[in-house]
Amino acid sequence: MKLIFCIDEKKGMMFFGKRQSQDSVLREWIINHTTGSNLWMSNYSAKQFKDLTGYIADDDYQIKASIGDYCFIEDNGYALEGVSEIILCDWNRKYQADKVFDIDLKANGFKKVDSEDIKGSSHDKITIETYRKG
């Protein structure tokens, strides 16, 4: 399983139950990147993808996802069991946050294998880093 998170410069994800930001170009990147695999997300996350296709909205997505599937995580908890890859999409901005990405990637055996910057619709630069276990 592969997990996708959006984070700010301090690894923040949400504030008072709401996403920090969103970007239409990043949504399209996620859909294109996961083509050929299942992309799972919560019903909350699916609201921002409503104009796109190629995802499965189900609040039990991490239980239902299979080995090669992707899970886009915003509002739900997550576990590392069975996770082979983590993609961090960094807004390159600081936002207020009370929910943060708290996985110590190195301590859990993940190594950075790729990094790219994209120009978003509402962000000049979004840095996308891919980490793989092993």
Model-predicted segments: where are they?
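Enzymes that bind and transform nitrogen-containing heteroaromatic metabolites
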Residues: 1-134
